[in-house]
Every structure is written in C-alpha cells, then in structure tokens.
Amino acid sequence: MRRAVDANDVARMFRDFTGGSANLYGSGHPEGKSYWKGTDGRDVTAYFIENQLDLLAKLKQQPRSQRDVLILPMMPQLRTTCHIAGEYALQPEDAYRHFADSVCVINDFDRRDYLYEVPLRTLCCRDFPNLITAGRSAAADGYAWDVLRVIPPAILTGQAAGLVCAHAMREGCGVAEVDIGKLQAALEAADVMVHFDDRLIPDGHQGGERADVGHL
C-alpha cells in the first residue's frame, strides 16, 4: 500500500507470483525436471496441480497480515504443445526473408523490428488437402514457434487460413493448391501486409538473420 501511495499508482498495490521458476524461454527450469507436453488430460492435470502447490508454498512464505490473495490462476499456461508437419516449418533464421507464397507479415513480440513473412506452406500439408491451421499449431521450429504462436500472428494467419478455405472451395482444389496470386491479392485488398517493404529492415540487418533470444 505504501508503495502505491508514494507512487500515486494503484497498480503498485498488486503483486504476482508464479508456481515455477522457469521464464518464457525456458531459462530457470529445474534441473532434472521433465517437461509438460500438454497433449493429454493427465499431463495437463499434473502440471496444474504441481504449479498450484508451488504457488501456495510461495504465498505461505509471505507475511499474512500484509496482503490478501485475490485470485489464483485457473488456466494452464501451455503456450506451445504440438503443431502440424507443414510443407515448410518457419525457422528462427527466416527473419527479414521473403517468401513467394507469403500470406502475412508478423514480428517478434520481444523485438518488434524483427519481421517475418509467413508462407502458406506453414499452414498446410499437401497430404491433407482439406486441413489448414493457424497460430501456434502452424509449422515452426525453435524460437520461430514462439514468434508465430502469439495472438497477433494467430489473428493474421487465421484470417489467411479462412480465406484459403474460401478460395479452395471456389477453385475446387486442396488448400495447398490455391492460386497464390489471387489469394495474396484478396489479402492485400483486406489491408493485410503480405510482403514487407525492405525499407523497414533496420540498418545492420539482412534477410536470413537468426532471431533467437534463448528458446530451449
């Protein structure tokens, strides 16, 4: 309370605690601790219970008279679980690289000037002509999966995926076989940036640069 009053900022009244010690990129993961995949109910339940117990143990170490517990997290924060084996998997070194079949441009949420074009091939597989995906379930490796999984890229790839389906139905073909020129024109007509302007590349950077901040 004193910090909130001194700073004239009510947000200073609140503190948050996490169950585990690992950060967004996997640093701080306890040695010898297995990873939760989040692909079945038992795994998700084990993750949830253990993290809640760790969180309560941390709270018990705090002075009880100095704060009230307002809420405990009720949603497992599993950010990457599984994705398709697409025709192409977006790579960390694809920053500033152009793709002929790009359907949108996204950026690294940690460093907004790291630009990626997302090729249609990351959203589908020719072996499954009626299957397409978006966001974190699209094909990507390493840190590129982190870049692709967050909400703005999920929105853009989701919009592209929906439009691909409409074009596939109209053209009578699989999702990987749509006329890419017509698709890109339709996306651009909807104000979607399909290819980034090279003038947006910061000085000292170039296509094929690896953007990685420590993903395991």
Predicted regions and their residues:
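Flavin (FAD/FMN)-binding glycine-rich loop and adjacent Rossmann-like elements that form
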Residues: 1-216
